[in-house]
């Protein structure tokens, strides 16, 4: 008996991806996924992930620890996007990588079959171009931790040369420039505005036990607001932005702290973190005139919203809140008047059924009762009068306490419950909870 190779994949895998993790990813219904990162991309050669898997060269992880097997390359990432019915967003290596490498990557993904890279793609099993729309020119090139770090002045030239080469291959792609509030943004926006569609911003928040639950939660919306306000200022102060609508792509945002339980940087997330993420979603809605795209970072393990062991997987507390808001909360902002601390309240119309949805976050320790008044019991949406029909449901994410967390292989304790609201005039929300109220219309 001769055995060439033995597969360590579970027998129910789907094209190499774990079925249980794929099911959780599908539940999130994320509209776009960014790959391959992150600090990793500044030392990544996309050619390493092409061709037969068994012949791909393993490489030392250029940014973190361990070895990158290169089992997942462009083809596998695109297949994952197909399985999840989501859009791909590819970051090119603008650190140690060069202009030709980036342009070739665009051609490999989007070029016709008769182009050099298109022919190679066809040889590897994909004749039809993928037509990837979203591309970022590097990652966090403002930081000295980044492979290929250089001065702002030098990177301005590098960004423009990358953009010219990538657009020469495919003028329809949308380019996202590396951003960082301060002098970096001022230089990039002043000198590269004609060579970008969006500008990337990142932020991470730390543990604030000493400041209390509310302080911990409010870190996220305050950072979103800080960045959005900075860009409003740039529009006033930078002549190159006149007449342009270069909005923010917040393609990394999250909490990042705590012990590494799930492998390298594999942190645990608590209910208090989920409340902060919910508050962030409220703030993104309020700042949607400035923020075009927001990508929670990351997906599985590390600082992800899904936690997995070798045998089990589950939504972290942050995954539960992302799933809840994707399923129930609307996307068309509605003005909210009044204030009742400590509640954070936002409202949106759900375009699929014209329901009026409210997000109510209670980052406090006590139950809060508030009055809900929809003026006239109706609203206008897309030249139609929508009247409340009296059917109301409240979805509540909470747990035993603010430090509750979910563990793979165990019953989740941070989870969503659903109940009908009989009285929409007097609404009660429990302590340390994120709530989505859905008001039906006719």
Residue ranges and their predicted role:
Residues 1-185, 189-198, 224-225, 229-251, ...:
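Non-catalytic accessory regions flanking glycosidase/transglycosidase catalytic cores in CAZymes
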Residues 203-219:
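Active-site His/acidic residue clusters
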């Amino acid at each position: 008996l001769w055995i060439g190779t033995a597969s360590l994949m579970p027998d129910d895998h789907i094209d190499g991806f774990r079925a249980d993790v794929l099911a959780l990813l599908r539940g999130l219904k994320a509209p776009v996924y960014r790959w391959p990162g992150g600090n990793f991309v500044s030392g990544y050669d996309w050619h390493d992930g092409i061709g037969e898997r068994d012949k791909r060269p393993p490489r030392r992880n250029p940014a973190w620890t361990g070895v990158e097997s290169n089992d997942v390359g462009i083809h596998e990432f695109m297949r994952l996007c197909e399985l999840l019915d989501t859009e791909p967003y590819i970051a090119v290596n603008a650190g140690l990588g060069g202009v030709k490498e980036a342009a070739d990557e665009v051609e490999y993904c989007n070029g016709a079959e008769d182009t050099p890279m298109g022919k190679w793609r066809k040889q590897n099993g994909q004749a039809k171009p993928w037509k990837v729309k979203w591309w970022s020119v590097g990652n966090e090139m403002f930081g000295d931790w980044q492979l290929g770090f250089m001065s702002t002045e030098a990177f301005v030239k590098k960004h423009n040369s990358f953009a010219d080469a990538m657009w020469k291959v495919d003028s329809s792609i949308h380019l996202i420039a590396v951003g960082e509030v301060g002098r970096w943004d001022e230089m990039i926006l002043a000198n590269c505005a004609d060579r970008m569609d969006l500008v990337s911003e990142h932020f991470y928040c730390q543990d604030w036990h000493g400041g209390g639950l509310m302080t911990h939660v409010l870190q996220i919306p305050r950072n979103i607001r800080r960045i959005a306000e900075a860009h409003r200022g740039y529009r006033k102060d930078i002549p190159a932005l006149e007449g342009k609508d270069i909005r923010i792509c917040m393609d990394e945002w999250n909490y990042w702290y705590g012990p590494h339980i799930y492998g390298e940087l594999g942190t645990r997330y608590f209910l208090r973190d989920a409340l902060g993420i919910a508050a962030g979603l409220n703030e993104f809605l309020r700042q949607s005139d400035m923020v075009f795209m927001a990508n929670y970072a990351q997906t599985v393990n590390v600082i992800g919203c899904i936690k997995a062991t070798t045998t089990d997987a589950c939504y972290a507390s942050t995954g539960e809140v992302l799933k809840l808001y994707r399923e129930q909360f609307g996307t068309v902002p509605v003005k909210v008047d009044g204030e009742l601390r400590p509640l954070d309240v936002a409202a949106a119309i759900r375009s699929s059924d014209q329901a009026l949805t409210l997000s109510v976050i209670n980052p406090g320790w006590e139950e809060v009762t508030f009055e809900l008044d929809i003026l006239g019991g109706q609203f206008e949406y897309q030249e139609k009068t929508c009247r409340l029909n009296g059917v109301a449901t409240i979805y509540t994410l909470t747990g035993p306490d603010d430090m509750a967390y979910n563990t793979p292989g165990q019953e989740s304790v941070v989870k969503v419950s659903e109940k009908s609201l009989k009285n929409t005039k007097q609404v009660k929300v429990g302590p340390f909870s994120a709530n989505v109220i859905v008001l039906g219309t006719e």
